[in-house]
């Protein structure tokens, strides 16, 4: 059973996390450089959910409280829908929320969704998984830090727009699924993003017609690769092959991006 929108939440006066979750948060923030401070807002309180909270085509305004599940991060061991903090159904909006470190799967979207001013204090497996549907998927403001691998995982089709988002200490900001059983043409539009200390800003599957468009207002400091192209596969037992990086017909941007 999932908690439905409108049911009673379990409120807590302080962040209720296990020792492992605290350790994960400390590890994620321990690398903060003197020249960059992750601008996560102050929390207005904390909420620990016993079950995933579903937003069924409506708007949920979290009032800048910190929401978690009271569990330890399991690293890159992939969880399921029941491990998410929020599931946003088609047409739903999640806004003004901090996702705590005491969780595994962050936020899932099932269909078109808007994620507005949502912050992840420490990413576990993924921050945001766009599971199904053809979009549009809109990520407006907010930010994430401490992602060993992906921040935004795009499994459905359509277009993802990421604007005014801050990402720090990360593997990839955006990845079009490289080995999903059902593959689609996917597109990502990145505008005004601040990216610091990462491996890849974007990874796309050019063999499926994916594109990434990155505007000149996006800045990147100590990001090793801005846009990588992969040969994706529909075999989940195979790993996609990276075939190129840099500006192209599929990776649409002007090099170099400005420093943050």
Swiss-Prot record:
One Pfam family per UniProt: Pectate_lyase
Name the record gives this protein: Pectate lyase H
Keywords, in A-Z order: Calcium, Carbohydrate metabolism, Cell wall biogenesis/degradation, Lyase, Polysaccharide degradation, Secreted, Signal
Reaction catalyzed: Eliminative cleavage of (1->4)-alpha-D-galacturonan to give oligosaccharides with 4-deoxy-alpha-D-galact-4-enuronosyl groups at their non-reducing ends
Role of this protein: Pectinolytic enzyme consist of four classes of enzymes: pectin lyase, polygalacturonase, pectin methylesterase and rhamnogalacturonase. Among pectinolytic enzymes, pectin lyase is the most important in depolymerization of pectin, since it cleaves internal glycosidic bonds of highly methylated pectins. Favors pectate, the anion, over pectin, the methyl ester.
Molecular functions (GO terms): pectate lyase activity
Cofactor: Ca(2+)
UniProt record, GO biological process: cell wall organization; pectin catabolic process
pH dependence remark: Optimum pH is 7.8.
Top-tier EC class: lyase
Cofactor remark: Binds 1 Ca(2+) ion per subunit.
GO cellular component, one term: extracellular region
Family as reported in the entry's similarity comment: Belongs to the polysaccharide lyase 3 family.
Signal sequence residues: 1-17
Top-level taxon in the UniProt lineage: Eukaryota
Compartments, record wording: Secreted
Temperature-activity note from the record: Optimum temperature is 22 degrees Celsius.
Broad class of where this protein is predominantly found: secreted
EC nos: 4.2.2.2
């Amino acid at each position: 059973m999932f908690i439905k929108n409108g049911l009673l939440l379990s409120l807590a006066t302080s962040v209720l996390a296990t020792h492992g979750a605290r350790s994960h948060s400390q590890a994620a923030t321990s690398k903060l450089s003197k020249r960059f401070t992750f601008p996560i807002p102050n929390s207005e309180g904390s909420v620990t959910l016993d079950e995933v909270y579903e937003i069924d085509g409506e708007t949920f305004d979290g009032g800048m409280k910190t929401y978690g599940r009271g569990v330890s991060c399991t690293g890159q061991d992939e969880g399921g829908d029941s491990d998410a903090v929020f599931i946003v159904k088609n047409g739903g909006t999640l806004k003004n929320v901090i996702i705590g470190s005491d969780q595994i799967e962050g936020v899932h979207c099932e269909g078109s969704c808007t994620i507005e001013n949502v912050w992840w204090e420490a990413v576990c497996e993924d921050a945001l998984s766009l599971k199904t549907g053809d979009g549009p998927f809109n990520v407006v403001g907010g930010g994430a830090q401490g992602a060993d691998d992906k921040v935004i995982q795009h499994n459905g089709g359509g277009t993802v727009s990421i604007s005014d988002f801050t990402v720090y200490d990360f593997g990839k900001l955006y990845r079009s699924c490289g080995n999903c059983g059902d593959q689609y043409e996917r597109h990502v539009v990145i505008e005004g993003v601040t990216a610091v200390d990462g491996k890849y800003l974007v990874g796309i599957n050019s063999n499926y017609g994916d594109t990434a468009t990155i505007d000149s207002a996006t800045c990147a400091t100590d990001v090793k690769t801005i846009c990588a192209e992969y040969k994706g596969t529909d075999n989940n037992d195979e790993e996609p092959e990276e075939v190129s990086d840099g500006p192209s017909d599929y990776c649409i941007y002007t090099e170099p991006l400005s420093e943050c």
